Amino acid sequence: MVNGLQYEKLENTDIFYNRFFFATLQRYSNKIMNNPYEKTLDGLIIDDPVKSFFYWCKERENIRIKRENGEKPPWTSDPIFQQGRFLNTFREDDKGSKAVLQFCDPVKSSLKELIHALFFARWCNQQTTLNRLTLSDLKNPSSLKDLLLNQMDQPWSSEAYPVVPVHWDGIKYERLEACTELFPNIINFLLDNILASNRNVVTATNLINQTFQMTNDFPIFMTVIDISWFRPDIISPESPVPTGIGAKPYLDRLQNHLDLENHHATIKKMISLQGEYWPSIRRQLTPVDVEYISCENRKYFSYKNGTKLFEGKNLFITNE
């Protein structure tokens, strides 16, 4: 299971070259999910969800460019973008992912070192910590623990997504112990399962979690998909991804509007439409991009629908 994500049963497509992957998707397609976002768009009319999807992409990218160029806020006339928090259109522009990619880049030519660095980075996922550490710090577990606990701004790790315990050889490893003590000793296990995945992120995630037994394996998923930045020959950027509970309501709207059979087909269609709706796009969208941008569109239209409010952590504050 990836972050409690809903898997769809995708029949008669070419993605089922891997029987393990098929069995995984089929098993989770039948699981009843308790999705807190399921009804967030109920009653809201979205005339053209495809056009709205690409509007969000272009407007959010324009905001990022203006902000990085030092222009004064609000950077947009859209009141929802002025008040709400959103990720960037391209995930490599978000500060967390940017820190992960910069931290791991020096070892991109060594697959074992890259896997170690990425697993540590996604278990940490804290920009300020990753920006201060070096890859050589990962080689000494006791020294690394001291660095994280006593010499870094606290908290040393981010709560952007939950990181639950890892189980290995009868021992439960909490977040700190997993990324400092365990991972350096199981690189061959991680490498073997990633190579056995046939470049598929879901297959690799599930192979690893058969042993880890994490109740929420989203950190594994994020780590494996990040491999595609550096080694697309190992994990394909075009690898199909499961539908997250946050993305499901908007992907449902897109699927219905496009009259397609499932989210996988919907994501493929959205990728094919980007040249029509955004000819100047700086790079090709991938399945994971479309999935998470659909989640951001669900957030955007939840504000419009009054099911999400501009308060607390949802409220954008200019100088943060």
Model-derived segments and their meaning:
Residues 62-158, 188:
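Phosphate-/polyanion-interacting regions in eukaryotic proteins
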Residues 106-110, 211-212, 238-239:
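A general structural signal for short secondary-structure junctions and capping/turn motifs
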Residues 70, 210-213:
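Intrinsically disordered, low-complexity coil segments
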Residues 2-93, 99, 176-203, 221, ...:
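C-terminal accessory module of base-excision DNA glycosylases/AP lyases that mediates lesion recognition
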Residues 128-211:
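Alpha-helical ds-nucleic-acid-binding substructure associated with the helix-hairpin-helix region
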